[in-house]
């Protein structure tokens, strides 16, 4: 009887396959504006219970935050107005915990120059870091069939600080550097409107740029 592969994250015996990123990110036909099934040809990696089924609440948190993010494309917005809205009606506790910190802000689109009012809210940074770390490790395993045992550092490109403008300037510099670095690197993923990624491999590290709903981007650095 063939043995299952070990967990992509911790190396324990795998008990199932984990979708990378979580399947919840990808709309079913009834939740997509064109009736398309975005759940075809998804990436899967072997995982133990602790790094798959036990993190289902984190999957839902990621879905809420990504679809509510300002850079999300029309698919992400539609997914929020369908699947996420139904979930909110059934289980309102999560959305209440997210929007309790909401602040009305005015933003400017640096590409068009248009200005408009919207809401900003505080996210659970540590929770998102853990979620994106899992995804980055999953992508690494998918690409190499080996488990990454080094460190993973993630940066959400659209995140902003209301208290430290210097942090925002630093983040902006990192995003511009990422734009230059990943320019010309092909996008991978069968459903790019929902999720795709870019990867650059070096001998001792690799960089992965995650794209959710078009422009909700996260840079992950995998280094020893």
Go through each PLM region and give its residues.
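N-terminal alpha-helical interaction blocks
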Residues: 1-2
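Histidine-centered nuclease catalytic patch
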Residues: 6-44, 60-61
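Short Fe-S-cluster ligation motifs
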Residues: 34-49, 77-92
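Short Cys/His-centered divalent metal-binding micro-motifs
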Residues: 41-65
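A broadly used, surface-exposed interaction patch
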Residues: 51, 66-79
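Amphipathic alpha-helical interaction segments
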Residues: 54-62, 72, 142, 146
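Short flanking/linker segments adjacent to small metal-binding domains or redox-active Cys/His motifs
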Residues: 86-123
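C-terminal, charged low-complexity interaction regions
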Residues: 113-224
